[in-house]
Curated annotation (Swiss-Prot):
The lineage of its organism: Bacteria, Bacillati, Actinomycetota, Actinomycetes, Micrococcales. It is found in: Cytoplasm. Catalyzes the transfer of the enolpyruvyl moiety of phosphoenolpyruvate (PEP) to the 5-hydroxyl of shikimate-3-phosphate (S3P) to produce enolpyruvyl shikimate-3-phosphate and inorganic phosphate. It comes from the Bacteria. It catalyses: 3-phosphoshikimate + phosphoenolpyruvate = 5-O-(1-carboxyvinyl)-3-phosphoshikimate + phosphate. This is 3-phosphoshikimate 1-carboxyvinyltransferase. The gene is aroA. Its main location: cytoplasm. It is an enzyme of class 2 (transferase). One of its GO terms (cellular component) is cytoplasm. Belongs to the EPSP synthase family.
Length: 445
């Protein structure tokens, strides 16, 4: 895999703290879920009255979402007395009968939720909305969302790219109806249309029609649950179709759960070193894919408990290899792969072919960078095969991918001399990561 766009990487190397064989232990409070934060923000912008989102994630992805919604006419106001990870937010929704507006531009950055969730909202806007983002975002697939909008009668201009940049010419309304898309590349294609459907003129029936299922299905269930909690008639019709009935959405007053996917690197620190790490405020029931940590980490030999909202992981003396289907929680794969590279036995990660279309081609990136540290990793049709081998230090490139950066940090706990290029890319979903990591594991590289 080539390292395009990484000419600056050698100038920004972060020495990953090395633990010299000592266990990592501590308690880590994790900021709010990115997936929930951005869903709540979108729904609040579509509501009929102001909303309050408590303990939202403040990161590049959520800031891009806030800016996009403000561009379309919502007002987002930080409230006083911020907590440890930033202020609560008041959202005044987009006016429904706004007059035609001058052309506007939305910067998606590298945020999948922005580039996919906001175009259907732009169709409800009156006027021209241009979308673009980072260079790396221009290779992320957008076809199913744009195709779905066209089926609904929305005028979309993309010069046949099915990717950024593109233009949506909104008329202020979308009729609704039945839409069929190929959602095998991302569950976000489904969530994008379901969220906006609360403001369509008639019900939306959305069908996935392609070989194979929809990856990361818990994220679709998360979208449905967020809609239902707001009083919307939203449901799964069958394994491949969903239905949303439009209607007024009351103002939200919600508290965002901690981001359980972002809890992963801190839990992995305990697993990799035989320590004990606790995450407070872990929900008993959740639609977050990160809740799979409760089932994944014991496969490596770790002990896990969830008592009174505190999830605690104690690592084993020796990491076992694993054989895991991660189709429902692909965002956990970089952290899991880092642990597999430290395990004493072979591992196989399956069901994650769709990661080739994430912030980077994560399968190619993981195999390239792990092998660059002496690993024995092979890409398979739908995942990775990882053999045990002795690793050595070196530069771990991140490809502007936040989860690649945290994977490199995990490896550095056990492998001296690992240098992570562009640790600042963690600002995408966890700006505080370098500080939080140093507080938990120490700062010695």
């Amino acid at each position: 895999m080539t390292r395009n766009g990484l000419s600056h990487a050698q100038d920004d190397l972060w020495p990953a703290p090395f633990r010299h064989g000592s266990p990592v232990s501590g308690t880590v409070a994790v900021p709010g879920s990115k997936s929930l934060t951005n869903r709540y923000l979108v729904l609040a912008a579509l509501a009929s009255e102001p909303s309050l989102v408590r303990r939202p994630l403040h990161s590049r992805d959520s800031a891009l979402m806030v800016a996009a919604l403000q561009t379309l006419g919502a007002a987002v106001t930080p409230l006083p007395d911020p907590g440890p990870f930033g202020p609560d937010l008041r959202i005044d929704p987009v006016r429904r009968s706004a007059p035609a507006a001058d052309p506007v531009r939305i910067d998606c950055g590298l945020a999948g939720t922005v580039m996919r969730f906001v175009p259907p909202l732009a169709a409800l806007h009156t006027g021209q909305v241009d979308f673009d983002g980072d260079d790396a975002a221009r290779v992320r697939p957008m076809g199913p969302v744009l195709d779905g909008l066209r089926q609904l009668g929305v005028h979309v201009v993309d010069q046949g790219r099915a990717a950024l940049p593109f233009r949506v010419l909104g008329t202020g309304s979308v009729p609704g109806g039945t839409v069929t898309i190929d959602a095998s590349g991302s569950s976000q294609f489904v969530s994008a249309l379901l969220l906006a459907a609360v403001r369509f003129d008639s019900p939306l029936v959305l069908r996935h029609d392609a070989p194979g299922g929809v990856p990361s299905l818990p994220h679709v269930e998360m979208t449905l649950q967020v809609l239902r909690d707001a009083g919307v008639d939203a449901r799964r019709v069958d394994e491949r179709s969903w239905r949303v009935v439009p209607g007024d959405v009351a103002g939200l007053d919600v508290t965002v759960e901690p981001d359980l996917s972002n809890a992963g690197p801190f839990l992995a620190a305990a697993v990799a070193t035989g320590g004990t790490v606790s995450i407070p405020d872990w929900p008993q029931h959740t639609t977050q894919g990160g809740d799979h940590w409760r089932h994944i980490l014991p496969r490596f030999g770790a002990d896990v408990t969830l008592r009174e909202g505190v999830f605690t992981v104690t690592g084993p003396r020796e990491l076992r290899g694993v054989d895991l289907d991660l189709s429902e929680a692909g965002e956990l794969a970089p952290t899991v792969a880092a642990l597999c590279a430290l395990a004493s036995g072979p591992s196989r990660l399956r069901g994650i072919a769709h990661l080739r279309g994430h912030e980077t081609d994560r399968l190619a990136a993981l195999s390239t960078e792990l092998n660059g540290l002496g690993g024995a990793v092979t890409e398979t049709l739908d995942g990775l095969a990882i053999e045990p081998t002795a690793l050595h230090g070196g530069v771990f490139h991140t490809y502007q991918d936040h989860r690649m950066a945290t994977a490199g940090a995990i490896l550095g706990l056990r492998v001296p001399g690992v240098q992570v290029a562009d640790i600042a890319t963690t600002a995408k979903t966890l700006p505080e990561f370098p500080r939080m990591w140093a507080e938990l594991v120490g700062s010695e590289g």
